[in-house]
């Protein structure tokens, strides 16, 4: 069995043809050199270019992610500022509405007080006129009664003086 293995390794003729082995080794080396120059070099260049493209795409993606995060932060800040501004506008509107309400109530009170004062002065003036009318009627009635009592007629001027005198005496009591 060892002999069969030796025949297999040594070749069928039983000897190694070193010329063929050297030619095959040289052919293999030339083939490797040609592959390196014409296949491995361009293939390596393509792989290097692809690696650079992938790295550039990764860098671009990271930059885009950073830009997106920055934009998101800016949008959050703008949203916060907008919400604060809306809140301030609402608060200002509430304050202004309260002020307008107070002003309207104040103006209504001023008008109501003015109307009350006008009504009171009108009432007082009508009261004074009514009192004056009553005084005139009382004086006329007093003169009439006095003239009937005395059964004599006195002048109108004397009657008024007499009534005024009685009214003054009645007012003093």
Curated annotation (Swiss-Prot):
It is found in: Cell membrane. The keyword Lyase does not apply. It holds the Pfam family ATP-synt_B. InterPro entries: ATP_synth_B-like_membr_sf, ATP_synth_b/b'su_bac/chlpt, ATP_synth_F0_bsu_bac, ATP_synthase_B_chain. CDD domains: ATP-synt_Fo_b. Keywords: ATP synthesis, Cell membrane, CF(0), Hydrogen ion transport, Ion transport, Membrane, Transmembrane, Transmembrane helix, Transport. GO terms for cellular component: plasma membrane; proton-transporting ATP synthase complex. It comes from the Bacteria. Coiled coil: none annotated. The chain crosses the membrane at residues 15-35. It is a single-pass membrane protein. GO terms for molecular function: proton-transporting ATP synthase activity, rotational mechanism; proton-transporting ATPase activity, rotational mechanism. NCBIfam families: ATP_synt_b (TIGR01144), PRK13453.1 (NF009987). Belongs to the ATPase B chain family. HAMAP family: ATP_synth_b_bprime. F-type ATPases have 2 components, F(1) - the catalytic core - and F(0) - the membrane proton channel. F(1) has five subunits: alpha(3), beta(3), gamma(1), delta(1), epsilon(1). F(0) has three main subunits: a(1), b(2) and c(10-14). The alpha and beta chains form an alternating ring which encloses part of the gamma chain. F(1) is attached to F(0) by a central stalk formed by the gamma and epsilon chains, while a peripheral stalk is formed by the delta and b chains. F(1)F(0) ATP synthase produces ATP from ADP in the presence of a proton or sodium gradient. F-type ATPases consist of two structural domains, F(1) containing the extramembraneous catalytic core and F(0) containing the membrane proton channel, linked together by a central stalk and a peripheral stalk. During catalysis, ATP synthesis in the catalytic domain of F(1) is coupled via a rotary mechanism of the central stalk subunits to proton translocation. This is ATP synthase subunit b. It comes from Staphylococcus aureus (strain MRSA252). The lineage of its organism: Bacteria, Bacillati, Bacillota, Bacilli, Bacillales.
């Amino acid at each position: 069995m060892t002999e069969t293995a030796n025949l297999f390794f040594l070749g069928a003729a039983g000897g190694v043809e070193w010329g063929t082995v050297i030619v095959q080794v040289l052919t293999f080396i030339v083939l490797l050199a040609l592959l390196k120059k014409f296949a491995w070099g361009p293939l390596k260049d393509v792989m290097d270019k692809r690696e650079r493209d992938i790295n550039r795409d990764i860098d671009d993606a990271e930059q885009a992610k950073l830009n997106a995060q920055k934009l998101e932060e800016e949008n959050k800040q703008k949203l916060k500022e907008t919400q604060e501004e809306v809140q301030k506008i609402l608060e200002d509107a509430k304050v202004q509405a309260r002020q307008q309400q107070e002003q309207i109530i104040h103006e209504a009170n001023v008008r109501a007080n003015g109307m009350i004062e006008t009504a009171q002065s009108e009432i007082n003036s009508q009261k004074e006129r009514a009192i004056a009318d009553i005084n005139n009627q009382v004086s006329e009635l007093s003169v009439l009664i006095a003239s009937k009592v005395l059964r004599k007629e006195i002048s109108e001027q004397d009657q008024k003086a007499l009534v005024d005198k009685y009214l003054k005496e009645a007012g003093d009591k």
